[in-house]
Amino acid sequence: MDNLKYLNHIQLYFDDEKEIPDLPIQILQKMPNLTKMTISECSCLEVFQTQIPEIVEKRVLTHLKILKLDNVSKLQSIGSEDSPWLNVICDSEKLQQLYVINCPDLKTLVHSTPSVTFTYVKEMYIDNCNELTYLFTLSSVNKLENLEHIEVTDCESMEAIVLKEEDDISEEIKLQKLKRVELNDLSSLECFYSGNDTLRLPSLMQVDIWICPKMEFFSRGDIYLNSSFKGIQASNVSSDDLVFHHDLNSSVQKVFLQQVTTFNSESIN
């Protein structure tokens, strides 16, 4: 057990979805250098269910830098009262990378009355979560003060990365540190932001758009970038030239037309 103090990555894998896992908190307390945790093939997030009060009170998992949730089949959102131990991790100032992969029941990344803000998260990777229609609402996106990289792949219902709901009060969106946005194989995606409020992205360097056949614009409002923005990567070949035409919305429109032309020519052939 003494060797656990050297462990920096733990992967919890459950091959029986009917099994209700329960990992003793005493084991976690013997892992002071644990920085990465992966939970795979798990039907629910009751991994530490019997010891939730201790985990929340002692903040046992707040030193994690990387959290990966892979095929947690009943996960519907993050930030609800059903998984307070997960909320403690996601709101920790140490957490830098969040991966959410193959979660078929995930309907919203952030719960409607969230207990977490992801304020300290720098990188977010979402892959193959087919019930997701958006990642953030207007009311939650400005809390992502340290977010540098978003990658969303193969989420067939995704319509917007940031959604403006009917009762949202208009406000300027500022993602001060966001450097890169990667949007891959999103068949329903129409835009990054669905509203018309001003969008400020002073650190943005590159946007990747690949197989997003419905994406005709980035945002309907004004978009302010700095000279650091290089353009849009519109293919899966990193050495290809970036697309830039006047501004970000015009560049997205150009990529849209290019991909429509490519799709039509491939259909004919």
Locations of regions flagged by a protein language model:
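Cross-kingdom leucine-rich repeat
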Residues: 1-269
